[in-house]
Swiss-Prot record:
The keyword Cell membrane applies. The gene is BMPR2. Changing C123S: In PPH1; loss of function in BMP signaling pathway; does not localize to the cell surface. This is Bone morphogenetic protein receptor type-2. Its EC number is 2.7.11.30. Residues 1-26 form the signal peptide. Changing C123R: In PPH1; loss of function in BMP signaling pathway; does not localize to the cell surface. Highly expressed in heart and liver.
Length: 1038
C-alpha cells in the first residue's frame, strides 16, 4: 500500500546523469552505480576514482547495494545520506529495484527518519514509503493504546475479583448453614433410621382424651400396648413436621421429656391427609387435669415442680457429645396442659409444635424461614410481659426465648403449690385454678393479659396461709417471684430453678425432725417471731449452738440453779385447766401433753436457741407464770460448789402454759430496729423509742417483771425457791429433783446491755451497806422481755444468799479495817467465813472467764447490743434529774489522789475491806450545790450514793444537794440503741447505801466515802435477803 507521499521526487540534473551512468553500467556489469552524498565527507576507504563529484554518484563494489537516508520533519524531506550498502544481512531486505521504505520508522528523533535500500543502479535517488499509516493522533499513539488496554484489563479484573469475593462469601455462609443443617440432617437420618419399623395398620384409636388447637389426642393401641396418638390435620402440617423433628433431635431422650415412638402420615377414608404422632401413654394425663383432681403434700409438690424444671433445663442445654449434637431448644408453649404426669409422681414435657432450636442468635425451624416470628406462643395466659409488649430482645434470641419459658414455669409453680396441703394447715385446700383465672377468667384476651401483666404488672396472688414466715415457704415464694420477674434478664435460669427446687425438698426433710416447717395456723405469730430472726441474730456464748440473743445475760453463770423465761413451742407447758376440753389458748396442745415431763436436753436447748426478744411483756395477764429450769455446774467447776446451801432443793416447777395473749402482745419489727439504728439520730431515736415502746406502768401490782432480778440473785446464791401461781392453776412440780439432776443450760456471756426499767425504793432502815453495781459488768438487774410467762408473786420467806464485795478505798498512810469475811442474813444469821470464801473465789473466777474470750471483748466498735430490742417500757418520771446529775458528777469528778474508776475497771487496784452487814457510821460531808445537766446515756450504771447522812441509809433517788458527791465511774462507751432514763419511783426494791470506809485526802482531813462495790439486797414483801462479803481484790459480783 502506497501513501500520498509516494510521489517521486526528481532532481533536475538526473535525466542526463542517468543516461550517462547507464551507459557506463552497461560496460561494467559487475559493479553497482549508486547516488552518493555524504555531508560529513568521511573517509571510508573508498578511492577518489570511484566517486564522481560532478554528478554525485559512486561506483560500488561487487555485491553491494544502494541505500538512502532521509529526514522527514514538518512536512519537508531532506536528504541526509546516500551511497553503497555493503552490510551483510538478509538479502531479501534490499532486493527491491526501487528504494522502498517498508519498515516502521525507528523511534530515534520521534520517528522522522526514513531508510531504504535497493539492488539496481541509481535506485537510491528517490524513495517510496510502503508501511501502515500512523494513528490520527501523532503524539505517541502506541502509548495511548497500551494505557487504555491496561485500564480495561484492570477494571475487568476488579469486577471479576468482586464477583468472586461475593460468591465466596455467599458460598461460605451457605456452607456454614449447610454444615449445621447437614449435621442436623445427618442426625435426623440417624434418628429416623433408629425409629422402630412399626406397621401403622395395627394402630387402633380407642377413645378421644383431648383436643387442642392443632389437633386431637386419642388413646390408642399399637401392637397390643397403650399409646397416645396426636392427630394433625393437613392445615397443621407444619406443626406436625416441627414437633416430629424436635423429637428426632439426637440426645432428646430424657426422663422428663415425653417419649416419642413414631410419626407418619396417612390418607383417611374420605381422601383427606392426616398426620400422626405416636407417643407413650401417661394415664394421669396433663398436669392441669391432675391438679384439678388431686392434692399433694409438700414433698410431692416439690417432686412435680422439680421434674418439670429438670426437663426444661435439659431442653435449654446445648449438648455436643461425640458425633451427636443437641442444640438448645426453646419450648415457647409451656403450660400445665403441655406437661404430663407419670405414675411415679414426676412430670414430662410434651407438645413441641411451636418449639425452636436455638443456635446462638439464630433460630432454626425446619421448613420455615430463619426469621420466624419469635412472638408466637401457644397460650395467651402464659405470655411473658415482654412478649405481650412486643419487646423481645432480638439481639439475643436464645436468652430471650429461654426467659419466656421461665416466666411460664413460675406460673406452673404457683398452680402446683396452690394444691399443696401442707401450705394450708387447718383449712381446706382451694380448688385448682389456672394462673390468672381469678383475674381474667377462663378465656382471657390478648388485651386483657396485656393490661394485667404488662401494664399493671400483676401476678397470681399468694394466699394468706402462705404468709407463714418459715424458711421453706419464704424460699418457695422467692423462687416463684424470681421466675416471673418483670425484668426478663433478672429471671432465674432453668438450671438455677432446678437447684432451688431440690433445696426446698432438703429444707423440709431437714427441718421436720426438729420442728414442723409449716405449723398450724394458731401458731403463725409464734413461728414468725421464732423463725424470722434466728438466722440474723448472731450466736453468742461459749456454746453457740445452744445460745441466742434472747438468753438472759447475767454476770454470774455458774450458780446451782438459774431461773429462765422460755418462749418457744418446745417449752414445757403446764397441765391444762380442763381435762375434758382442749385448751385452745395453748400452743401445740398435743406437744404439751407429750412433753409435760422432765425436760430433755434437746427440748431445753431448742427452747433457748429459737427465741428472740421481740415481744412486749408489759401486758401479760396474771394467769401467766414462770418456767424454771435448773442449770448444772460445768465439769471443770463442780469442785467449787461445796456450799451446803445448794443441798436443800424443793419441788421445782418445770412446765407452764403459753397462751395466745402472750403472742398477741406488741412485737418490735426487726426492720424498724435496723432503720432506727442506721438512719435516725440519737435524739430522734429516743423519741421514736418512747412512742413505739411505751407501755403500762411497770410498777403496777399486775406486773411482776421487776421481781425477776431479785429472785434470780437469791436462787443463784441458795439454789432453793418455791413458786406459786395465783391465777393459772398449779404449776407442774417435780418433787425431790435437784437442779444438778436436771439437764444443764448453756453458759452465756456477760455482754454489756443497756438498762431497762430499774425502779428503786427507799427503805427506812438504819445502818445498812449500800448497793453499787460493778462497773465492769454493768447493771445486770434487767427486765426479762422474752414474751412468755413470768413470775407474779414471791412469797418465800426463807433466807437467800447474796454475794457482796466490799472494795474499800484507803488514802495514803492510813490503815484499813479488818479483813474478816462473814455472811450475815437480815435476821441475824451469819455464815462461816470458809463457805463465803469458797463462793467468793468461784464467783471471781467466773467473772474473769466472762471477759477473756475474743467474742466477749468489750469495745466501742463492736457493741453487742445492736441486735437487741429497744426499750419497751415507759419508765416513770420523778427523780431522774437527781440520779443523772449524780452520774454526771461522779463521771466528771476524779477521785482525790489522782485515781479514777472507769466502766471497764481499768483503774489501779486499791485495797479492799470486808465489813459486817451492819455497816460502820461515818461523818457526813456538807452537801454541795446541784448543777442542772443534760441527761446522759450511760451504758453501765453506777447506782451508789455519793454521800451519807449520819449513819442512816441514803436513798438513791435523793438529790445531790443532800451531800457532797464523790468521784465515780466514767462512761466510756456510747450506747448505739436509743433509750431514755425516766423517773425513778418507789417500788418493791429497797437498796440502802451507807459509808463503810474513809478515804484520806492530801490535806489530811477525813472525808466520808462509800464502798466501791458493796451491795445489800432485801425483799420488801416479807422475804429476807442475805449479804455476803468478800475480800478478793477487783471483784464485783451480784
Amino acid at each position: 500500500m502506497t501513501s500520498s507521499l509516494q510521489r517521486p521526487w526528481r532532481v533536475p540534473w538526473l535525466p542526463w546523469t542517468i543516461l550517462l551512468v547507464s551507459t557506463a553500467a552497461a560496460s561494467q556489469n559487475q559493479e553497482r552505480l549508486c547516488a552518493f552524498k555524504d555531508p560529513y565527507q568521511q573517509d571510508l576507504g573508498i578511492g577518489e576514482s570511484r566517486i564522481s563529484h560532478e554528478n554525485g554518484t559512486i561506483l560500488c563494489s561487487k555485491g553491494s547495494t544502494c541505500y538512502g537516508l532521509w529526514e522527514k520533519s514538518k512536512g519537508d524531506i531532506n536528504l541526509v545520506k546516500q551511497g553503497c550498502w555493503s552490510h551483510i544481512g538478509d538479502p531479501q531486505e534490499c532486493h527491491y529495484e526501487e528504494c522502498v521504505v517498508t519498515t516502521t520508522p525507528p523511534s530515534i528523533q520521534n520517528g522522522t527518519y526514513r531508510f531504504c535500500c535497493c539492488s539496481t543502479d541509481l535506485c537510491n535517488v528517490n524513495f517510496t514509503e510502503n508501511f501502515p499509516p500512523p494513528d490520527t493522533t501523532p503524539l505517541s499513539p502506541p502509548h495511548s493504546f497500551n494505557r487504555d488496554e491496561t485500564i480495561i484489563i484492570a477494571l475487568a479484573s476488579v469486577s471479576v475479583l468482586a464477583v468472586l469475593i461475593v460468591a465466596l462469601c455467599f458460598g461460605y455462609r451457605m456452607l456454614t448453614g449447610d454444615r449445621k443443617q447437614g449435621l442436623h440432617s445427618m442426625n435426623m437420618m440417624e434418628a429416623a433410621a433408629s425409629e422402630p419399623s412399626l406397621d401403622l395398620d395395627n394402630l387402633k384409636l380407642l377413645e378421644l382424651i383431648g383436643r387442642g388447637r392443632y389437633g386431637a389426642v386419642y388413646k390408642g393401641s399399637l401392637d397390643e400396648r397403650p399409646v397416645a396418638v396426636k392427630v394433625f390435620s393437613f392445615a397443621n402440617r407444619q406443626n406436625f413436621i416441627n414437633e416430629k423433628n424436635i423429637y428426632r433431635v439426637p440426645l432428646m431422650e430424657h426422663d422428663n421429656i415425653a417419649r416419642f415412638i413414631v410419626g407418619d402420615e396417612r390418607v383417611t377414608a374420605d381422601g383427606r391427609m392426616e398426620y400422626l404422632l405416636v407417643m407413650e401413654y401417661y394415664p394421669n394425663g396433663s398436669l392441669c387435669k391432675y391438679l384439678s383432681l388431686h392434692t399433694s403434700d409438700w414433698v410431692s409438690s416439690c417432686r412435680l415442680a422439680h421434674s418439670v424444671t429438670r426437663g426444661l433445663a435439659y431442653l435449654h442445654t446445648e449438648l455436643p457429645r461425640g458425633d451427636h449434637y443437641k442444640p438448645a431448644i426453646s419450648h415457647r408453649d409451656l403450660n400445665s396442659r403441655n406437661v404430663l404426669v407419670k405414675n411415679d409422681g414426676t412430670c414430662v414435657i410434651s407438645d413441641f409444635g411451636l418449639s425452636m432450636r436455638l443456635t446462638g442468635n439464630r433460630l432454626v425451624r425446619p421448613g420455615e424461614e430463619d426469621n420466624a416470628a419469635i412472638s408466637e406462643v401457644g397460650t395467651i395466659r402464659y405470655m411473658a410481659p415482654e412478649v405481650l409488649e412486643g419487646a423481645v430482645n432480638l439481639r439475643d434470641c436464645e436468652s430471650a426465648l429461654k426467659q419466656v419459658d421461665m416466666y411460664a414455669l413460675g406460673l406452673i409453680y404457683w398452680e402446683i403449690f396452690m394444691r399443696c396441703t401442707d401450705l394450708f394447715p387447718g383449712e381446706s385446700v382451694p380448688e385448682y385454678q389456672m394462673a390468672f383465672q381469678t383475674e381474667v377468667g377462663n378465656h382471657p384476651t390478648f388485651e386483657d393479659m396485656q393490661v394485667l401483666v404488662s401494664r399493671e404488672k400483676q401476678r397470681p396472688k399468694f394466699p394468706e396461709a402462705w404468709k407463714e414466715n418459715s424458711l421453706a415457704v419464704r424460699s418457695l415464694k422467692e423462687t416463684i417471684e424470681d421466675c416471673w420477674d418483670q425484668d426478663a434478664e433478672a429471671r432465674l435460669t432453668a438450671q438455677c430453678a432446678e437447684e432451688r427446687m431440690a433445696e426446698l425438698m432438703m429444707i423440709w426433710e431437714r427441718n421436720k425432725s426438729v420442728s414442723p416447717t409449716v405449723n398450724p395456723m394458731s401458731t403463725a405469730m409464734q413461728n414468725e417471731r421464732n423463725l424470722s430472726h434466728n438466722r440474723r441474730v448472731p450466736k453468742i456464748g461459749p456454746y453457740p449452738d445452744y445460745s441466742s440473743s434472747s438468753y438472759i445475760e447475767d454476770s454470774i453463770h455458774h450458780t446451782d440453779s438459774i431461773v429462765k423465761n422460755i418462749s418457744s413451742e418446745h417449752s414445757m407447758s403446764s397441765t391444762p385447766l380442763t381435762i375434758g376440753e382442749k385448751n385452745r389458748n395453748s400452743i401445740n396442745y398435743e406437744r404439751q401433753q407429750a412433753q409435760a415431763r422432765i425436760p430433755s436436753p434437746e427440748t431445753s436447748v431448742t427452747s433457748l436457741s429459737t427465741n428472740t426478744t421481740t415481744t412486749n411483756t408489759t401486758g401479760l395477764t396474771p394467769s401467766t407464770g414462770m418456767t424454771t429450769i435448773s442449770e448444772m455446774p460445768y465439769p471443770d467447776e463442780t469442785n467449787l460448789h461445796t456450799t451446803n446451801v445448794a443441798q436443800s432443793i424443793g419441788p421445782t416447777p418445770v412446765c407452764l402454759q403459753l397462751t395466745e395473749e402472750d403472742l398477741e402482745t406488741n412485737k418490735l419489727d426487726p426492720k424498724e430496729v435496723d432503720k432506727n439504728l442506721k438512719e435516725s439520730s440519737d435524739e430522734n431515736l429516743m423519741e421514736h423509742s418512747l412512742k413505739q415502746f411505751s407501755g403500762p406502768d411497770p410498777l403496777s401490782s399486775t406486773s411482776s417483771s421487776l421481781l425477776y432480778p431479785l429472785i434470780k440473785l437469791a436462787v443463784e446464791a441458795t439454789g432453793q425457791q418455791d413458786f406459786t401461781q395465783t391465777a393459772n392453776g398449779q404449776a407442774c412440780l417435780i418433787p425431790d429433783v435437784l437442779p444438778t439432776q436436771i439437764y444443764p443450760l448453756p453458759k452465756q456471756q456477760n455482754l454489756p446491755k443497756r438498762p431497762t426499767s430499774l425502779p428503786l425504793n427507799t427503805k427506812n432502815s438504819t445502818k445498812e451497806p449500800r448497793l453499787k453495781f460493778g462497773s465492769k459488768h454493768k447493771s445486770n438487774l434487767k427486765q426479762v422481755e422474752t414474751g412468755v410467762a413470768k413470775m407474779n408473786t414471791i412469797n418465800a420467806a426463807e433466807p437467800h444468799v447474796v454475794t457482796v464485795t466490799m472494795n474499800g478505798v484507803a488514802g495514803r498512810n492510813h490503815s484499813v479495817n479488818s479483813h474478816a469475811a462473814t455472811t450475815q442474813y437480815a435476821n441475824g444469821t451469819v455464815l462461816s467465813g470458809q463457805t463465803t470464801n469458797i463462793v467468793t473465789h468461784r464467783a471471781q473466777e467466773m467473772l474473769q472467764n466472762q471477759f477473756i474470750g475474743e467474742d466477749t471483748r468489750l469495745n466501742i466498735n463492736s457493741s453487742p447490743d445492736e441486735h437487741e430490742p429497744l426499750l419497751r417500757r415507759e419508765q416513770q418520771a420523778g427523780h431522774d434529774e437527781g440520779v443523772l446529775d449524780r452520774l454526771v458528777d461522779r463521771r466528771e469528778r476524779p477521785l482525790e489522789g489522782g485515781r479514777t474508776n472507769s466502766n471497764n475497771n481499768n483503774s489501779n487496784p486499791c485495797s479492799e475491806q470486808d465489813v459486817l452487814a451492819q455497816g460502820v457510821p461515818s461523818t457526813a460531808a456538807d452537801p454541795g450545790p446541784s448543777k442542772p445537766r443534760r441527761a446522759q446515756r450511760p451504758n453501765s450504771l453506777d447506782l451508789s450514793a455519793t454521800n451519807v447522812l449520819d449513819g442512816s441509809s441514803i436513798q438513791i433517788g435523793e438529790s445531790t444537794q443532800d451531800g457532797k458527791s464523790g468521784s465515780g465511774e466514767k462512761i466510756k462507751k456510747r450506747v448505739k440503741t436509743p433509750y431514755s432514763l425516766k423517773r425513778w419511783r418507789p417500788s418493791t426494791w429497797v437498796i440502802s447505801t451507807e459509808s463503810l470506809d474513809c478515804e484520806v485526802n492530801n490535806n489530811g482531813s477525813n472525808r466520808a466515802v462509800h464502798s466501791k462495790s458493796s451491795t445489800a439486797v432485801y425483799l420488801a414483801e416479807g422475804g429476807t435477803a442475805t449479804t455476803m462479803v468478800s475480800k478478793d481484790i477487783g471483784m464485783n459480783c451480784l
